[in-house]
């Protein structure tokens, strides 16, 4: 069957906009909820934190699938790519249904176990029961979206995301301001919009991709083993990152009594995320190209493509982060009028220039290594330096030396840059060439 072979730019632009819309939907939800109450925002944020922990489990399959599917597509075996999708779909669906039932039934017990603030309990319980009870959608959407992307169909996934977000916005407005459903309304709107998103990506995949008709097949156990071989380390890295960031925030909460430092980090993060989404899109697009080239044994093209993606990423990250730093004094005023807070956010955005350069390099080379089959090395780097540099740096520079949020950002930037150097050196060693999944 015909694969939609595309360039780095053609693949990355739709992925970038899809990531951007995903980020904006979260911001819109927060802004609309804030009109109800600060407690509602806090409750939903808390519930989403715990839902995210469970969603990591679904990443084991979806991230491993991309490597297996792209390499087999590059090797001219789309039938095996279809087989990988089917196995991933079944595996994720079974786990997701069990997880959905667990969250729906035991939402209150989970929140009591983590000692949530009493003022947030009822709203968080409502949200966790509804959205958590439908978390199977979070397991299935990435499977179908990845399936479209690896065959070169990135616009369809983008349109599904846009339509889902528009529906979410409209339903939020109706449920919040017309029907006065509060948190229950936001949760219901979230679930309905995700159902629409799932229907679109599943339908587009069935209509556009005919890999099912290709005759290539191998033992299902072998495919599942390959998926887990790549996906499990990737999911571990995500889990380690989330735990590390939890510790960083915990240290930052100890820096003052009014929460200024951790709040400044939140504002700086919201601004810097626009730079991050471009780097993430380039990394995902290059991962697809890398898989295609490795499947076809085109190793020189892998090197050229990954270097090109990293250069594009560094240039865009530099331009955006420098712009944000220079205009930080004005951008921060969107969130707050507190002069001290604005000055602190501006300082963090200046350090963020270095952080973003490390992060985009880390993303591009790290994703390329995972797609090539060399998935363990990024986890080892993360396990060591996320905790030594990011967590340890936050404690040492932020608390011990008294640099507070500025010190925390020095630690975070150090982590990204050290890991970036490690990823580049690992890629240049060429060891990933022997980790391919296709015979």
Where are these regions (language model features)?
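Short alpha-helical transmembrane segments in multi-pass integral membrane proteins
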Residues: 1-15, 69-136, 178-232, 290-355, ...
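Small-residue-rich hydrophobic transmembrane alpha-helices
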Residues: 41-101, 138-157, 249, 262-328, ...
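Short runs within selected transmembrane alpha-helices of multi-pass transporters and secretion channels
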Residues: 62, 130-149, 157-168, 186-201, ...
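Helix-terminus/linker motif at the lipid-water interface of multi-pass membrane proteins
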Residues: 24-42, 111-118, 174-181, 239-270, ...
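Small-residue hotspots at the loop-to-helix junctions and early N-terminal turns
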Residues: 38-49, 124, 128, 187, ...
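Small-residue (Gly/Pro/Ala) motifs that create kinks and tight helix-helix packing interfaces
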Residues: 29, 145, 171-172, 176, ...
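Transmembrane helical elements of multi-pass membrane transporters/channels
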Residues: 10-29, 130, 164, 193-197, ...
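Residue-level hotspots within pore-lining transmembrane alpha-helices
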Residues: 17, 21, 25, 54-58, ...
């Amino acid at each position: 069957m015909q694969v939609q072979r595309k360039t780095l730019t053609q693949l990355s632009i739709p992925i970038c906009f899809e990531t951007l819309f995903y980020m904006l939907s979260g911001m819109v939800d927060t802004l609309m909820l804030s009109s109800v109450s600060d407690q509602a925002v806090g409750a939903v944020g808390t519930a989403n934190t715990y839902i995210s922990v469970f969603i990591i489990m679904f990443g084991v399959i979806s991230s491993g699938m991309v490597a297996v599917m792209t390499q087999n597509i590059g090797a001219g075996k789309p039938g095996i790519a279809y087989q990988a999708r089917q196995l991933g779909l079944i595996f994720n669906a079974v786990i997701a249904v069990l997880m959905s039932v667990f969250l729906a039934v035991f939402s209150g017990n989970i929140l009591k176990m983590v000692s949530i603030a009493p003022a947030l309990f009822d709203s968080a319980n409502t949200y966790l029961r509804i959205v958590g009870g439908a978390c199977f959608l979070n397991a299935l959407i990435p499977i179908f979206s990845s399936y479209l992307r690896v065959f070169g169909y990135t616009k369809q996934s983008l349109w599904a995301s846009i339509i889902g977000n528009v529906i979410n916005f409209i339903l939020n407005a109706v449920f919040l301001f017309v029907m006065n459903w509060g948190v229950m309304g936001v949760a219901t709107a979230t679930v309905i919009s995700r159902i629409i998103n799932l229907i679109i990506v599943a339908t587009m995949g069935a209509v556009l991709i005919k890999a099912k008709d290709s005759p290539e097949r191998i033992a299902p156990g072998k495919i599942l083993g390959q998926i887990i071989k790549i996906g499990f380390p990737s999911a571990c890295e995500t889990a380690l990152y989330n735990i590390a960031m939890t510790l960083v925030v915990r240290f930052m909460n100890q820096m003052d009594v009014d929460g200024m430092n951790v709040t400044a980090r939140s504002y700086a993060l919201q601004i810097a995320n626009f730079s991050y989404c471009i780097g993430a899109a380039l990394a995902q697009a290059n991962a697809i190209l890398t898989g295609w080239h490795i499947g076809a044994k085109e190793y020189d093209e892998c090197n050229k493509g990954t270097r090109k993606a990293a250069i594009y990423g560094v240039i865009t990250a530099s331009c955006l982060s420098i712009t944000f730093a220079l205009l930080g004094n004005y951008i921060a005023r969107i969130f707050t009028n507190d002069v001290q807070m604005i000055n602190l956010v501006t300082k963090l955005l200046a350090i963020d220039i270095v952080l973003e350069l490390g992060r985009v390099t880390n993303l591009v080379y790290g994703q390329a290594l995972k797609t090539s089959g060399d998935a363990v090395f990024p986890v080892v780097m993360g396990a060591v330096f996320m905790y030594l540099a990011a967590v340890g740096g936050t404690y040492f520079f932020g608390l011990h030396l008294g640099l507070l949020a500025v010190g925390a950002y020095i630690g975070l930037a150090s982590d990204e840059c050290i890991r970036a150097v490690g990823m580049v050196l690992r890629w240049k060693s060429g060891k990933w060439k022997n980790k391919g999944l296709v015979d």
